[in-house]
């Protein structure tokens, strides 16, 4: 038995390893204590319940998946950002098999609202990032978005495609690229009846 103090980082690392090896069902206070070679009481010093432990574990997995990229240009170009997101999702699926499955989402929802809350916070962070990039990508035409069709609305559309890909474990971003490259068709969905303002491409044309 390891009688030395165990840090929260060690506990979360052990939890991630258990999920990586055997999925969500493998995580329990007792299993994590055994992996850390400490008593269950040591784990309870940090987490009052399994649900609390899972909540922080979920957050730590999302952080590992969406670790800050070395190339900051990723956040200045929509296509580059989408490509990076899909690559990180593929990494996450390899490191934590089944993490993105529909079963896992239901599990997190049923287990404790804290896990669901932290998952939704991550999703909101991605959506906000897409929105910011849509506002700042210099290649996007300045007249594409307006009060009727905002950057936020298009970011939500892009994210919905990403979310479906995540659940299906399909890490080919081509469908999102298609929506992005043919952004005028997305605008037409919102124009009833269609008018000339719908006929816009997203990019500046030289």
Locate the predicted segments by residue.
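Helix-turn-helix
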Residues: 4, 10, 14, 18-52, ...
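Amphipathic alpha-helical packing segments from all-alpha helical-bundle domains
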Residues: 94-98, 111-140, 149-152, 156
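Short, basic, alpha-helical segments at the C-terminal edge of helix-turn-helix-like DNA-binding modules
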Residues: 59-66
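Helix-loop "lid/cap" segments that line or gate small-molecule binding pockets
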Residues: 86-94, 102-110, 133-135, 166, ...
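Short, charged helix-capping/linker segments at alpha-helix termini
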Residues: 25-26, 142-149
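Hydrophobic alpha-helical connector segments
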Residues: 56, 70-95, 151-155
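Short alpha-helical scaffolding segments that buttress acidic/His motifs in well-ordered protein cores
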Residues: 89, 103, 158-162, 199
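N-terminal intrinsically disordered/low-complexity leader segments
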Residues: 1-6, 143-145, 191, 195-206
